[in-house]
């Protein structure tokens, strides 16, 4: 009996250890996320519930010029006792021709499972992006795995060109961030349907080694009638062995919440 209990406890400990290293990162374009949406209690409660399902959520399309929405939303996320923290970018659109499309990015992350160590907007000296990508470095607490997340919301009509320019961002990241060997690109790439064909994407350097596109071209990440793989995850090859899967989190059917669903990857221990 004692031996059986020891086996059970050992198995339980092994399962707990494996589970502790299973970790989920989401990307979520919360369409036109500003004070008007924050005033809709049911919508905000749905959004907060979604964030609490993941260890890190990269949010795009925060459109509030007063910069109040991201912080106000964090209070709702944590109202039930969660311990999320927020890191929010400055408004993007540094170049004069991009200012009419300026938005903020945000990372909401569970402080019990992950630490954010640094963050910065990409230094877009060549004006490759309408909204400069936002980059943050993280350390997973369960095993001290370090990685960098770069999130972007491309301009739809320039999607292919902006996705191509992520290769430049990949070269810039190690000049700005320490321990930047493992990189995760995520966000609303607009990488599908009329904005970016598979053939156009296949011609890009970011589509080839050392990069691995986790979310396939035939995915459906939006609430429109047409199935389009707008929202993507791309990881460097040295993270590929950690990726335990991906999915679309279809937690709502109303476009009042967003016109995109969250997309997420599971980042496990090295397999």
Residues of each region from the PLM?
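Positively charged n-region of N-terminal signal peptides that target proteins for export
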Residues: 1-6
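Bacterial N-terminal signal peptides
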Residues: 7-17
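Divalent cation-coordinating acidic motifs and surrounding scaffolds
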Residues: 21-271
């Amino acid at each position: 009996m004692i031996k059986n209990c020891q086996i059970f406890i050992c198995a339980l400990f092994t399962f707990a250890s494996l589970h502790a290293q299973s970790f989920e990162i989401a990307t979520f374009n919360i369409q036109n996320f500003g004070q008007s949406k924050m005033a809709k209690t049911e919508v905000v409660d749905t959004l907060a519930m979604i964030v609490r399902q993941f260890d890190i959520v990269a949010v795009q399309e925060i459109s509030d010029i007063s910069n109040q929405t991201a912080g106000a939303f964090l209070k709702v996320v944590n109202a039930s006792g969660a311990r999320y923290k927020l890191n929010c970018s400055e408004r993007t659109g540094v170049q004069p021709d991009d200012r009419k499309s300026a938005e903020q990015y945000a990372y909401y992350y569970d402080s019990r499972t992950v630490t954010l160590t640094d963050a910065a907007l990409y230094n877009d000296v060549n004006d490759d992006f309408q909204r400069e990508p936002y980059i943050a470095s993280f350390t997973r607490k369960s095993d001290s795995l370090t990685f960098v997340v770069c999130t972007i919301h491309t301009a739809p009509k320039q999607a292919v060109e902006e996705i191509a320019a992520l290769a430049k961002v990949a070269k810039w990241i190690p000049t700005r961030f320490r321990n930047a060997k493992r990189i995760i690109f995520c966000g609303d790439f607009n990488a599908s349907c009329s904005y970016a064909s598979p053939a156009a994407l296949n011609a890009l350097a970011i589509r080839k080694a050392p990069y691995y596109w986790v979310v396939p071209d035939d995915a459906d990440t939006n609430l429109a009638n047409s199935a389009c793989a707008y929202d993507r995850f791309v990881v460097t090859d040295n993270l590929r062995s950690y990726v335990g899967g991906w999915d679309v989190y279809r937690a709502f059917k109303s476009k009042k919440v967003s016109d995109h669903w969250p997309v997420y990857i599971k980042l496990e221990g090295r397999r």
